[in-house]
Amino acid sequence: MDTDRLTALIADLDHPDKPTIRAAVDQLIGLARESVQVRTALEQRLVELGHRDYWPVAYVLGHLPQPSGATIRNLLDTLDHREPDIRWAIVLLLVRIAKTESSIINLLIELCENGTTNQKRMAIYGLRDLVLNDVVSLQALLSSLSDPDPTVRVAAATSLKNRTDGDERVRAALLQSYLLDADIKVRSAAAVTLANIGLPSEEFLRALKEASESDNSQSKKAATVALALLEKREPASIAGMRQR
């Protein structure tokens, strides 16, 4: 590997222009897969002080087998990046890594409780995309329905749609969110998710009917969407409600 070329590519990881960073990242991923020299240089760069960005280096190293603890920590830290596209690129990579390195799942679960608002949301989406069916990750999502930040609660409510375990617990928690949450976006997300899983309870149907007839346009819209979903899935339930 030409040393000058490698030095230039690694220097581009500090460039303020994202297309330049992406081009360097794409080249370095291919080179690092074939060269121990490149991987070693990148691992050294990851721990050097004084650089503008560290996530591009971690992103490259995260594509290699058995990424180091420093790489994983940097990727997790980057879930709080100010730019959404970078956060999403990182969480998708973490999901890929988690399929062979199961310890990542526990780190995502920890972030659901202890991370920043951005980290919590991205960790929730990561758990969602892993399509898990275990008690610990389910509890992390259910607990996130009570997070102080409404955007985290919305993420949890929408992500519970993918769960195929704990149906009763999921439905009960979503119903409480729909009935009691102070934020309309959370209530809307809970209603739509709840309309997509299992049989609707009488309490849920009553609440939807009341909301669909309310003067609050946001509540009415959310209830109407949920009722339309239920009518497709459970037409008998909706027909019975309308006869009351």
Provide a role label for each language-model segment.
Residues 6-14, 23, 155:
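Short terminal alpha-helical segments
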Residues 1-12, 33-47, 66-80, 99-112, ...:
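Amphipathic alpha-helical scaffolding segments comprising HEAT/armadillo-like alpha-solenoid repeats
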Residues 13-19, 44-52, 79-85, 112-118, ...:
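Short coil turns that connect the paired helices of HEAT/ARM alpha-solenoid repeats
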Residues 1, 19-34, 52-67, 77, ...:
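Structural detector for internal amphipathic alpha-helices that build alpha-solenoid repeat scaffolds
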